[in-house]
């Protein structure tokens, strides 16, 4: 009988597709966290470029606890009177870390040779409520920081409450409107500088692309677009504008996943081109190669590193 039926016309196919894609508002997916709206673009355009030598070693003592050692040697930029001038001084740092991983608890601590202490905590109180805490303790007066986040994940929305030092209070909310579109907003108030702000954001994603935008009362406008060429190749672009300072920056980049390596690179409107290569030499041994060229300042950065463990 199926062979005797006439084939569907183009209009019938389009109508059938629209019916199949009808939005079920009672079963919308959970959106990404508000602070991760641009995560795909950041992975391609904000790679961890460095200058000099970097060596990271991690040793697992058991399935949940591990120790890490990091050595960084290279020049550090210091402020100069002219924005087009770069001043670098040679520096070296050692960092000791301890990590505790559990399905419902994450503890990370880092101690630097200059006396700084970084601590991070993430605890899943329930399947939907997560508490996060970040702290920075330094020897410098009024430079220590602390932040607490309370994240709640609903079936089709996410909400977050932020509490920090200097009477900082913030809240974010993001809601899935369709299977592909999510809308959100944020508010914050800082007691000491007497500042407040509000922002709005939108994110649209499919299997092949991700587009996101964000605007805030501080004057910041951010737009990102990522096109997934294949499972291994992604192209990304972003646009950042500040209404008050009139600063504009745009960049394009790529993210290429090879069988044993990952290559990321970008170039922006300020004339800065950068690339980062991460290659797996063997199990537990990775090689890093970083390069950055600033045509405007006539400055360059080159670094290589090893990651063990």
UniProtKB/Swiss-Prot annotation:
What are the record keywords, sorted?
A: Acetylation, Ion transport, Membrane, Mitochondrion, Mitochondrion outer membrane, Porin, Protein transport, Transmembrane, Transmembrane beta strand, Transport
Record's keyword annotation contains Acetylation: yes
Tissue-specific expression: Expressed in roots, flowers, young cotyledons and leaves.
InterPro entries the record matches: Porin_dom_sf, Porin_Euk/Tom40, Tom40
Q: Which GO terms describe its molecular function?
A: porin activity; protein-transporting ATPase activity
User: Which CDD domains did the record assign?
Assistant: Porin3_Tom40
| Record localization | Mitochondrion outer membrane
Inducers of expression? Up-regulated after antimycin A or rotenone treatments. Accumulates in the mitochondrial transmembrane lipoprotein (MTL) complex during phosphate (Pi) starvation.
Q: Which residues carry this modification: N-acetylalanine?
A: 2
Where N-acetylmethionine occurs, the residues are 1
> Could you tell me the membrane topology recorded for this protein?
Multi-pass membrane protein
Q: Show the GO cellular component annotation of the record.
A: cytosol; mitochondrial inner membrane; mitochondrial outer membrane; mitochondrion; plant-type vacuole; pore complex
Q: Which residues cross the membrane?
A: none
Which terms under GO biological process does the entry name?
Answer: cellular response to phosphate starvation; monoatomic ion transport; protein import into mitochondrial matrix; protein targeting to mitochondrion
Q: Which purpose does this protein serve, as stated in its record?
A: Central component of the receptor complex responsible for the recognition and translocation of cytosolically synthesized mitochondrial preproteins. Together with TOM22 functions as the transit peptide receptor at the surface of the mitochondrion outer membrane and facilitates the movement of preproteins into the translocation pore. Directly involved in the pore formation.
Subunit composition? Answer: Forms part of the preprotein translocase complex of the outer mitochondrial membrane (TOM complex) which consists of at least 6 different proteins (TOM5, TOM6, TOM7, TOM20, TOM22/TOM9 and TOM40). Present in a large lipid-enriched complex called mitochondrial transmembrane lipoprotein (MTL) complex made of proteins located in the two mitochondrial membranes, including the TOM complex and the core components of the MICOS complex and containing at least digalactosyldiacylglycerol (DGDG). Binds to MIC60.
Would you identify the family this protein belongs to, as annotated? Belongs to the Tom40 family.
User: What's the protein name?
Assistant: Mitochondrial import receptor subunit TOM40-1
Organism source for this protein? Arabidopsis thaliana
């Amino acid at each position: 009988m199926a062979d005797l039926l006439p084939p569907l016309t183009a209009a019938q196919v389009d109508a059938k597709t629209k019916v199949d894609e009808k939005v079920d508002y009672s079963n919308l997916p959970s959106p990404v966290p508000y602070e991760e709206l641009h995560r795909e673009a950041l992975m391609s355009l904000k790679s961890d470029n460095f200058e000099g030598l970097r060596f990271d070693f991690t040793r697992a003592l058991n399935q949940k606890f591990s120790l890490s050692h990091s050595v960084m040697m290279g020049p550090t930029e210091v402020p100069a009177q002219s924005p087009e001038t770069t001043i670098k001084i040679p520096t070296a740092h050692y960092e000791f870390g301890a990590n505790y991983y559990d399905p419902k608890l994450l503890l990370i601590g880092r101690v630097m040779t200059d006396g700084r202490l970084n601590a991070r905590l993430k605890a899943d109180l329930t399947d939907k409520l997560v508490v996060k805490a970040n702290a920075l303790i330094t020897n410098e007066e009024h430079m220590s920081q602390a932040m607490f986040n309370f994240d709640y994940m609903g079936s089709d929305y996410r909400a977050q409450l932020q509490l920090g030092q200097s009477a900082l209070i913030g809240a974010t909310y993001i809601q899935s409107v369709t299977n592909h579109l999510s809308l959100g907003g944020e508010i914050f108030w800082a007691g000491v500088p007497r500042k407040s702000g509000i922002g709005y954001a939108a994110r649209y994603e499919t299997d092949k692309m991700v587009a996101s935008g964000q605007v805030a009362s501080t004057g910041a406008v951010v737009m990102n677009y990522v096109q997934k060429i294949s499972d291994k190749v992604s192209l990304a672009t972003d646009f950042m504008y500040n209404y008050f300072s009139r600063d504009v920056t745009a960049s394009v980049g790529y993210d290429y996943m090879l069988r044993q390596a990952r290559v990321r690179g970008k170039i922006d409107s300020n004339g800065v081109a950068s690339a980062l290569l991460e290659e797996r030499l063997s199990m537990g041994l990775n090689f890093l190669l970083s390069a950055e060229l600033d045509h405007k300042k006539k400055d360059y950065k080159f670094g290589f590193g090893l990651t063990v463990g």
